[in-house]
Amino acid sequence: MVTTTSPVKAESRNLSFYYSSGHKALKGITMPLYEKRITALIGPSGCGKSTFLRCFNRMHDLYPGNKYDGQIVMYPDNTNILDNGVDPIEVRMRISMVFQKPNPFPKSIYENVAYGLRVRGERNKRVVDDKVEEALKGAALWDEVKDRLHDLAFNLSGGQQQRLCIARALATDPEIMLFDEPTSALDPIATANIEELMSELRNKLTILVVTHNMQQAARVSDYTAYMYLGELIEYDDTDKIFTNPSRKETEDYITGKFG
């Protein structure tokens, strides 16, 4: 049983997902995301972790024929973000995403962070300047790049590029951030920096992270969900999942007997 005093920020309700091929990748998942907490998704490759994550900002809309069944409700406005009348662009302003590999745009450091603000329609240069600085500080990158904001983003190291992508996601003031294996392409030092940053971001954001690294899930998350073959097998406090899981399937995966 999950123990928390945090309100629910968003939740999936009986969520299923079908790829255009007809494959049912998610099977009736109901799961909360608690406000200003980190939830980790674990499970073997192909279990549906990333598919589930990408439902939250409607990334699947980019490919014709994909189909959602069920709801994802955001609070406090009780908006089902999967409704046809809800603009996916607006959803992605509220729910930002950081991908597995750093994917900076072929632009300057400054323009990478300013991009989302411009898409949103912000034209005031002072406002954009302030938000770029705020986002870079929020991603713990400002001190490293403040004197070369107009350098190409590709000149940054891999770890710096990933923090730049986090800054880009932060610039539009999202309520939720999605991380899809954000450290899998990084070295141990850069990984530690991203994990520390995620812990700091938890003070103002709700975070959902997919990771194949169970030690990482144990280190950074408050809650952990174990998925298998498109189903949610177990969801609980992270300490409970890793020390005393309720389901044998979870225990077998955690202890390396499976997966």
Swiss-Prot record:
GO terms for cellular component: plasma membrane. It is an enzyme of class 7 (translocase). The keyword Thylakoid does not apply. Its main location: membrane. Its EC number is 7.3.2.1. SMART domains: AAA. Pfam families: ABC_tran. It catalyses: phosphate(out) + ATP + H2O = ADP + 2 phosphate(in) + H(+). PROSITE patterns: ABC_TRANSPORTER_1 (PS00211), ABC_TRANSPORTER_2 (PS50893), PSTB (PS51238). The keyword Translocase applies. Keywords: ATP-binding, Cell inner membrane, Cell membrane, Membrane, Nucleotide-binding, Phosphate transport, Translocase, Transport. It is a peripheral membrane protein. Residues 10-254 form the ABC transporter domain. It comes from the Bacteria. InterPro entries: AAA+_ATPase, ABC_transporter-like_ATP-bd, ABC_transporter-like_CS, P-loop_NTPase, PstB-like. ATP binds at G43, P44, S45, G46, C47, G48, K49, S50. Part of the ABC transporter complex PstSACB involved in phosphate import. Responsible for energy coupling to the transport system. The complex is composed of two ATP-binding proteins (PstB), two transmembrane proteins (PstC and PstA) and a solute-binding protein (PstS). PANTHER family: ABC TRANSPORTER I FAMILY MEMBER 17. Belongs to the ABC transporter superfamily. Phosphate importer (TC 3.A.1.7) family. This is Phosphate import ATP-binding protein PstB. It comes from Methylobacillus flagellatus (strain ATCC 51484 / DSM 6875 / VKM B-1610 / KT). The gene is pstB.
